Regions:
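Conserved class I S-adenosyl-L-methionine
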Residues: 134-171
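A short glycine-rich, Lys/Arg-flanked "PGG" loop and its adjoining helix->strand segment in the class I
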Residues: 118-133
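A short beta-strand submotif of the Rossmann-like class I SAM-dependent methyltransferase core
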Residues: 104-110, 136
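A short acidic, Gly/Pro-enriched loop at the edge of an enzyme's catalytic core
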Residues: 88-105
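Short aromatic-enriched loop/helix-cap "lid" or pocket-rim segments at secondary-structure transitions
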Residues: 71-73, 88-89, 145-150, 217-223
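Conserved N-terminal segment of class I S-adenosyl-L-methionine
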Residues: 5-93, 255
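A C-terminal cap/extension of S-adenosyl-L-methionine-dependent methyltransferases
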Residues: 43, 198-262
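Short alpha-helix
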Residues: 180-202, 207
């Protein structure tokens, strides 16, 4: 077993080789252990995801390095790649669970990596109990954020893509391939949300909110640098919550999307 860095104080050196693990995930776990600001931000993301789900069983899709379990250990974490803390290795398009088993499904930066997002939404609906919720936090292509993502982020942004298209599944596809525009194309407007509900009639779009204005971009995410100390994340998030919604829609780097199973 590989002992990975823990988010307590300084980085703990791995006691064994991480051979067999995806090296990008190993690096992410190392950055997670070092950056207090990153952990503070993601714990707040986790809180928001859980608050938008009913009480009960929760499935975390695209769990990555399983950091969500620091917020809630009983969550079932699934990912297409194996990693310590991941309970189920599975493709999000074909979940290995029976119908109507979970009260909530949560995802953080996952939808924009999926080849067939509509197929996934149908699969999420299948495993949700009636009244259950799918809560997602994803990149938002707002006035400010899109310029940042276009220039500085390694993942591409293609606003001309058709997220409803039936593309062939590529078995050799890199699971980190992405189009950061997908969540915005699917949920940023009322007509887009109506099309989702028509295409997946068992789901209703409950909320689409815009957040992550200042603290998240200043943290550097999973990059090694940060422009904000961990102690300032809480006060800055409190300030962000006071920004009026019409302004947030132009400044936000992320969007919270909640769909409910009917």
């Amino acid at each position: 077993m590989v002992r990975l860095p823990q988010a307590q104080g300084h980085l703990i050196v791995m006691t064994q080789s991480a051979i067999g693990l995806n090296q990008r995930q190993v690096i992410h776990r190392q950055v997670w252990a070092r950056k207090k600001a990153l952990r503070a931000l993601y714990h707040d993301f986790h809180r928001q995801l859980f608050e938008n789900c009913p009480a009960g069983s929760v499935l975390d899709i695209g769990g990555g390095t399983a950091h969500i379990k620091e917020s809630r250990p009983d969550v079932v974490s699934a990912d297409i790649l194996s990693f310590p803390g991941i309970d189920v290795v599975a493709d999000a398009h074909r979940l290995p669970f029976r119908n109507e088993i979970f009260d909530g499904v949560v995802m953080l930066d996952v939808l924009h990596h999926l080849e067939r997002p509509i197929e996934f939404l149908k699969e999420a609906s299948r495993v949700l109990k009636p009244g259950g919720c799918l809560a997602m936090i994803e990149p938002a292509m707002t006035t400010i954020a899109r310029r940042f993502y276009d220039r500085f982020h390694e993942e591409p942004v293609d606003m001309n893509a058709d997220p409803f298209a039936l593309v062939a599944i590529d078995p050799d596809r890199d699971p980190f391939d992405a189009n950061q525009a997908i969540p915005t194309l699917l949920f940023a407007t009322a007509p887009a949300c109506r099309r989702i509900e028509q295409t997946v009639p068992s789901l209703r779009v409950r909320t689409v909110e815009w957040h992550s204005l200042f603290a998240y971009p200043m943290s550097g995410g999973f990059q090694k640098w940060s422009l904000i100390p961990g102690s300032l994340v809480g006060p800055m998030l409190a300030l962000e919550r006071k920004v009026p919604a019409p302004v947030r829609k132009h400044l936000a780097f992320r969007m919270m999307i909640v769909l409910q199973r009917i």
